[in-house]
Amino acid sequence: MNILFSRFSFLLLFLCSWTSFTFTTTEAYDALDPYGNITIKWDIMSWTGDGYVAVVTIFNFQQYRHIEAPGWQLGWSWMKKEVIWSMVGGQATEQGDCSKFKGNIPHCCKKTPAIVDLLPGTPYNQQISNCCRGGVISAWAQDPATAISSFQISVGQSGTTNTTVRAPRNITLKAPGPGYTCGPAKLVKPSRFISADKRRKTQSLLTWNITCTYSQFLARKTPTCCVSLSAFYNETIVPCPTCSCGCQNSSQAGTCVDPKIASVVPALGKNNLEPLLQCTQHMCPIRVHWHVKTSYKEYWRVKVAITNFNYNMNYSQWNLVVQHPNFDNLTKLFSFNYKPLNPYLNINDTAMLWGIKFYNDFLSQAGPVGNVQSELLFQKNPLEFTFEKGWAFPRRIYFNGDNCVMPPPDSYPWLPNASPNIATSPFVILLITFLSVLILM
């Protein structure tokens, strides 16, 4: 028996070790956006007396995950004793110790510089293309034109040839907080550029590519949004699960505000990364409510409402990703933009929704105007449409790329027992008839 127990323990230990080795909780693969990533392209455009001039471009190839205010911050470590002489379209957050330089003082002398985008309204002589939006980068599916950010950097003490120059290492990307893991810089084919008149092509002298992937677990240890449900055929409103994103009785006191005294909450600064939440049973910054509103003969209607419970954060260019099998029959969408993502090729069950520019693309902080809403009209497909067993509710919802906590399926609003839509077996009908006869006798 002892030998058998020892062998079993060894086998269990081996399986656990193999599992922990093979899978990690920080895995960045996203089934809805399998090829999504942020690619940083470092193009050396010319050589200088002691270094080079490069254009660094950040491409957000993620379909529905964007970088919101206060924007991205890009960092790295120099391989040698490089310095940044000057920058256009961006700036280092710290200059560092430049005391050994006389005359021209570098823009940054730190071994590990951190670069941020410039703000809108920057003078034109300090701008380049795709800069100066405060570090905000749109999702690729939402607005490809603004899913790019660039800056120009003049590097010294770095080498002046392809063989003497060294790529930066330990690249980090904050957007604006943690969540992204960046790989090493890889030498790739030089980038090619087309002149304004489209009659001439040029190319970089040398190009490095850095790929960064996102993990929600690395970004936040707890969820950031939850989903509540309701339907016209049931009086029950299913709330977000209790403690979806945290609990009020946590060890951190003062982390939420009673909505009755919300009017006296001091403004702690726009887009403060530290949340100040309204006290709720779910304690999530964002709640998405899905309400099955109406059923017509050939159509059915849903109302979607997004509510912000964070007094320290507003959301510009927000987006919502919803999985539901009836999106293939979406007929009309009111006051939101829509784009199918189709992660499974011909199966259209995933939709990306976002606000209309200058109308409702800005979700204000918690308060009377801290919500946006829309209605969706679906056509009924006789082969699959039903209100039974929670079919009318979404399978998954993402807000700004983060997976929201759904209520358990057994709590969904069900059809009332007397509904004609509930299929009744012949056995049940026969049993009811038999009991009725017995009562009459």
Curated annotation (Swiss-Prot):
Membrane topology recorded in Swiss-Prot or TrEMBL: Lipid-anchor; GPI-anchor
Propeptide positions: 418-441
GO cellular component: Golgi apparatus; Golgi medial cisterna; plasma membrane; side of membrane
GO biological process annotation, one example: mucilage biosynthetic process involved in seed coat development
Tissue and organ expression note: Expressed in roots, stems, leaves, flowers and siliques.
Localization annotation: Cell membrane
Keywords: Cell membrane, Glycoprotein, GPI-anchor, Lipoprotein, Membrane, Signal
Keyword Lipoprotein listed: yes
UniProt keyword Membrane present: yes
Signal peptide start-end: 1-28
Lipidated sites in chain (GPI-anchor amidated asparagine): 417
Glycosylation sites: 37, 162, 170, 209, 234, 249, 314, 329, 348
Recorded family membership: Belongs to the COBRA family.
Alphabetized PANTHER family for the sequence: COBRA-LIKE PROTEIN 2, PROTEIN COBRA
UniProt name for this protein: COBRA-like protein 2
